[in-house]
């Protein structure tokens, strides 16, 4: 391997490690915030305070809090010297981690947090301005900025690569295995294995309708041409030939549905394998997506949220869900049940809307409250 390849590999490894540390610390900070909001009335967690929950539950809460706080401290210590390599979104995440660490102070303050502390000599905002000027005049700032650009470039390349793998690998595995492996195997063993030749009432019903339509077409053609209708023997022969053809088509559709099931299973297994083998890259992809989403303006975020909710849980969403369910049923050769479709439409969009509103309340309201305010304004204050 050449020297440049080794440098690129080392840079990519550093980028993945830095993104992983930031993501773990950010998730831990969000966990502490959620514990504060849910159990301590959005106040600081105090181990000596007795909650109105069983002791085992409170012990679990404190254990999760201590673990998350330890992760925040570790991440803050690792990332403090690499602040110049972070972009604006990652800097906001780091600031949240540092605010959690500073709120709970040193390790000794976890068990007995201080009630008061001496005020700062200068406001923190003014100290931040001085620190920003110092960083701009520091000779090593240029190297830090270049390193940050390289890390963001590596993050983008890793995210695009793993995204392509997640999309292309399952599709290619499904198509190739279905064409060259599953299809010949099903054709070979379908006459011998009963479960590959299951009853096909829906396909048989479609074939019967086509046969009746074919009989009516023969009679209609005879009337149009002004000839005598076919006698019973000729009509029976033509209907027998057509019935044989329709039966063959129904068998082919049945086998095609079975092939689709096995091909989709192969694609699902390939997707799971890619996820297991690319766990570090998936964390980088998650950070890349967060940066892209939260980098949007408040109006763009609100527009995307309204568009998503109107498509999947809006007024016209039942028609879309009906088409989707019919397509899935046809893909797997299943009968389309209108009762099941109505039940699904009556329950699933409601559950999806509830989950989405809960996400807005618990997560987006903390990360981007201005987006929530814009969303309420675009929804007419609702």
Swiss-Prot record:
Keywords recorded for this protein, A-Z: Cell inner membrane, Cell membrane, Hydrogen ion transport, Ion transport, Membrane, Transmembrane, Transmembrane helix, Transport
Subcellular location: Cell inner membrane
Keyword Ligase: no
Main location: membrane
One term under GO cellular component: plasma membrane
Any one GO molecular function term: proton transmembrane transporter activity
Entry membrane topology: Multi-pass membrane protein
Annotated transmembrane regions: 162-182, 257-277, 305-325, 340-360
InterPro entries: CemA
Pfam family name, one: CemA
Record's protein name: Proton extrusion protein PxcA
Organism: Synechococcus sp. (strain CC9605)
């Amino acid at each position: 391997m050449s020297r440049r390849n080794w440098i690129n590999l080392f840079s990519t490894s550093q980028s993945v490690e830095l993104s992983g540390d930031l993501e773990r610390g950010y998730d831990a900070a969000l966990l502490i915030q959620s514990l504060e909001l849910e159990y301590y009335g959005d106040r600081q967690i105090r181990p000596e305070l007795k909650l109105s929950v069983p002791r085992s539950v409170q012990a679990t809460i404190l254990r999760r809090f201590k673990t998350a706080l330890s992760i925040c401290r570790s991440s803050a210590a690792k990332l403090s010297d690499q602040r110049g390599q972070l972009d604006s979104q990652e800097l906001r995440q780091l600031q949240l981690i540092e605010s959690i660490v500073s709120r709970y102070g040193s390790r000794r303050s976890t068990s007995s947090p201080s009630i008061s502390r001496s005020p700062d000599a200068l406001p923190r905002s003014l100290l931040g301005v001085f620190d920003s000027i110092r960083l701009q005049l520091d000779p090593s700032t240029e190297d830090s900025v270049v390193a940050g650009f390289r890390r963001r470039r590596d993050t983008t390349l890793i995210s695009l690569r793993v995204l392509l793998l997640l999309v292309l690998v399952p599709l290619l595995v499904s198509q190739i295995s279905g064409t060259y492996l599953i299809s010949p195997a099903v054709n070979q063993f379908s006459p011998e294995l009963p479960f590959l030749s299951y009853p096909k009432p829906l396909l048989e019903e479609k074939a019967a309708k086509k046969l009746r339509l074919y009989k009516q077409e023969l009679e209609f053609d005879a009337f149009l041409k002004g000839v005598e209708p076919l006698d019973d023997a000729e009509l029976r022969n033509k209907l027998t030939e057509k019935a044989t053809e329709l039966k063959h088509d129904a068998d082919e559709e049945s086998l095609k549905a079975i092939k689709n099931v096995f091909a989709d299973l192969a694609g699902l297994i390939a997707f799971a394998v890619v996820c297991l083998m690319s766990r570090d890259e998936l964390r980088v992809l998650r950070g890349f997506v967060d940066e892209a989403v939260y980098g949007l303006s408040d109006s763009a975020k609100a527009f995307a949220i309204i568009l998503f909710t109107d498509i999947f849980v809006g007024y016209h969403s039942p028609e879309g869900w009906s088409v989707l369910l019919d397509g899935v049923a046809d893909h797997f050769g299943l009968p389309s049940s209108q009762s099941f479709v109505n039940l699904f439409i009556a329950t699933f969009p409601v559950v999806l809307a509830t989950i989405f509103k809960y996400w807005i309340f618990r997560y987006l309201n903390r990360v981007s409250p201005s987006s929530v305010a814009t969303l309420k304004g675009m929804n007419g204050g609702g």
